[in-house]
Curated annotation (Swiss-Prot):
Enzyme Commission number(s) from the entry: 6.3.5.2
Name of the protein: GMP synthase [glutamine-hydrolyzing]
Top-level EC class: ligase
Gene: Gmps
Assembly behavior: Homodimer.
Organism annotation: Mus musculus (Mouse)
Length: 693
């Protein structure tokens, strides 16, 4: 049986339940196996007005039973159930008579406990898939026999445990199992994320029909809880809140103002030099209209030249540290974020000093959201979540302040759409509540900095696979070992569609010599971008299909872009040296301004959740024989549609955004000096994150 390879229980097993001080009658316990989507499960359950609490996977069964939980949900996680370091759990949770829903890793765990087997498949599934369902199963009642879901896994159920039946399949892969008499259900996909179209129906079936929950957990309760927590923690002390002007920090400040006296709240807007065009001025004006007095600090010089302390190397587990390069000479995305986060804190401390306040009597408030903490693998969000990227508001220094109890984060249990609802409850104006998010590090994380191209040993082989994919209809006539790999990673339906697309369109697909951050299978991926160009007018539906298919076949690719303009004859294999210098930032600032101005004027800004505009160090259209150096850069437009920012899809031109609007953006951005090409990000999340860094 799976007691983390069967042996001993860890000393801290049981979380906060074992003291018996709480009672959760009617609530659902989510046992956290380390999933990036763990808190999304929590949010989806609460959206259905059912109270949920998250505890470690190793929480003992007796504690769950004694505390009155009505049902159990086991999250996904990055481990294999057979790994030596697989997390410990109490198998008795399956024998206490509580309905259980196992998601991804949770399903594999359930299957293994009851005698089934799990093994690593040759093909990962990362992305959106059509799966078949048995809609006579209580879990899938009211659904179609085929549904669109998000799958992100490498291990799969092989032999189904006795007493369970298969209730969903993705091709020949088991996607759902059930033992209805014991109310035990497992799904390989993620019903909690927006990319699973009817995931909420599945969760509702489990919570209401199977577990018998009642819906009496409301947003108003959570607002009151936030205010109570602020009052209790701050008392008569002062709070310094860093305001970006976005919805998160504004709602955070509104909560502080409601909970505390006005003279206790010190609102500061720091212009870090990475703001959008005229951003700081508009932030100050908007907040003054709300009656919030803001101290604006121009700290661009401090950020450009900022440094921080870092481990000697990623492998070095000793406490030894090194001083980083200055930010304007740094190319590592992780180091950039850490420098920016720590510089924010240093400047906040300077403000405290200038105002003659005692540091020990001042709290730092942030509008940190749940996705920030999950992607940073913060213990506040999840004790096991794998690091995807460091967020500027969750650096080591911030964590140290948090450990000291000096950080106030009233929105730490909220996701973006919930913050908007809360903002409306607090009577904030709609233009602020519905504003597109803008990251605290600003344009700094929208410049792909590089000194040299990113080309590893797998670069040539991956390019050969992409050539086969882009010309699949011709490639199938010429036997090749890599062709067999492509076929092994795709279904017959995929191959038929690929044949159709490549017969109709002349495509060129290749790797770009840069890397961006992504997420695959609950873990961080940091890898290549695939570019697609064509002499034909773009068929956007086909391009979106290719963007889903390519990362499934090539796990070293986490992003796919379409390159506007004529076919790329000679893909770049070098880069334009790019750092966070004023000239580089000025170029991106203008591109961002043009794109967002066109989106606003089109009236479609409300249809798009966020639209990062990214500057890459890529110079196309150079004759290699002339050995022209790389000196221009290219821009990426990243439209993104999501409900929670944990998963999402690009806006498809012609559907969610008019083609003419996108083409107008391309035309205006191309006029900016030093711009080589414009690209359109076709990638969903996963495998690509919202931002490129």
């Amino acid at each position: 049986m799976a007691l983390c390879n069967g042996d001993s229980k860890p000393e801290n097993a049981g979380g906060d339940l074992k003291d018996g001080s709480h009672h959760y009658e009617g609530a659902v316990v989510i046992l956290d196996a380390g999933a990036q989507y763990g808190k999304v499960i929590d949010r989806r359950v609460r959206e259905l007005f059912v109270q949920s609490e998250i505890f470690p996977l190793e929480t003992p069964a007796f504690a769950i039973k004694e505390q009155g939980f009505r049902a159990i949900i086991i999250s996904g996680g990055p481990n294999s159930v057979y790994a030596e370091d697989a997390p410990w759990f109490d198998p008795a949770i399956f024998t206490i008579g509580k309905p259980i829903l196992g998601i991804c890793y949770g399903m594999q765990m359930m299957n293994k406990v009851f005698g089934g087997t799990v093994h690593k498949k040759s093909v990962r599934e990362d992305g959106v898939f059509n799966i078949s369902m048995d809609n006579t199963c209580s879990l899938f009642r009211g659904l179609q026999k085929e549904e669109i879901v998000l799958l992100t896994h490498g291990d799969s159920v092989d032999k189904v445990a006795d007493g369970f039946k298969v209730v969903a399949r993705s091709g020949n892969i088991v996607a759902g199992i059930a033992n209805e008499s014991k109310k035990l259900y497992g799904v390989q996909f993620h019903p909690e994320v927006g990319l699973t179209e009817n995931g909420k129906v599945i969760l509702k079936n489990f919570l209401y029909d199977i577990a018998g929950c009642s819906g009496n957990f409301t947003v108003q309760n959570r607002e009151l809880e936030c205010i109570r927590e602020i009052k209790e923690k701050v008392g008569t002390s002062k709070v310094l809140v860093l305001l970006s002007g976005g919805v998160d920090s504004t709602v955070c400040t509104a909560l502080l103002n409601r909970a505390l006296n006005q003279d206790q709240v010190i609102a500061v807007h720091i212009d870090n030099g990475f703001m959008r065009k005229r951003e700081s001025q508009s932030v100050e004006e908007a907040l003054k209209k709300l009656g919030i007095q803001v101290k604006v600090i121009n700290a661009a010089h401090s950020f450009y030249n900022g440094t921080t302390t870092l481990p000697i190397s990623d492998e070095d587990r000793t406490p030894r540290k090194r001083i980083s390069k200055t930010l304007n000479m740094t190319t590592s995305p992780e180091e950039k974020r850490k420098i920016i986060g720590d510089t924010f804190v240093k400047i906040a401390n300077e403000v405290i000093g200038e105002m003659s306040l005692k540091p020990e009597e001042v709290f730092l408030a942030q509008g940190t959201l749940r996705p920030d903490l999950i992607e940073s693998a913060s213990l506040v969000a999840s004790g096991k979540a794998e690091l995807i990227k460091t967020h500027h508001n969750d650096t080591e220094l911030i964590r140290k302040l948090r450990e000291e109890g000096k950080v106030i984060e009233p929105l730490k249990d909220f996701h973006k759409d919930e913050v908007r609802i809360l903002g409306r409850e607090l009577d904030l104006p709609e233009e602020l509540v519905s504003r597109h998010p803008f990251p605290g590090p600003g344009l700094a994380i929208r410049v792909i900095c590089a000194e040299e191209p990113y080309i590893c040993k797998d670069f040539p082989e991956t390019n050969n696979i992409l050539k086969i994919v882009a010309d699949f209809s011709a490639s199938v006539k010429k036997p090749h070992t890599l062709l067999q790999r492509v076929k092994a990673c795709t279904t017959e339906e995929d191959q038929e569609k690929l044949m159709q697309i490549t017969s109709l369109h002349s495509l060129n697909a290749f790797l770009l010599p840069i890397k961006t951050v992504g997420v695959q299978g609950d873990c961080r991926s940091y890898s290549y971008v695939c570019g697609i160009s064509s002499k034909d007018e773009p068929d956007w539906e086909s391009l979106i299909f290719l963007a889903r298919l390519i990362p499934r076949m090539c796990h070293n690719i986490n992003r796919v872009v379409y390159i506007f303009g004529p076919p790329v004859k000679e893909p770049p294999t070098d880069v334009t040296p790019t750092f966070l210098t004023t000239g580089v930032l000025s170029t991106l600032r203008q591109a961002d301004f043009e794109a967002h101005n066109i989106l606003r004027e089109s009236g479609f800004a409300g249809k798009i959740s966020q639209m990062p505009v990214i500057l890459t160090p890529l110079h196309f259209d150079r004759d290699p024989l002339q050995k022209q150096p790389s000196c221009q850069r290219s821009v990426v437009i990243r439209t993104f549609i999501t409900s929670d920012f944990m998963t999402g899809v690009p806006a498809t031109p012609g559907n969610e955004i008019p083609v003419e609007v996108v083409l107008k953006m391309v035309t205006e951005i191309k006029k900016i000096p030093g711009i080589s090409r414009i690209m359109y990000d076709l990638t969903s999340k996963p495998p690509g994150t919202t931002e490129w860094e």
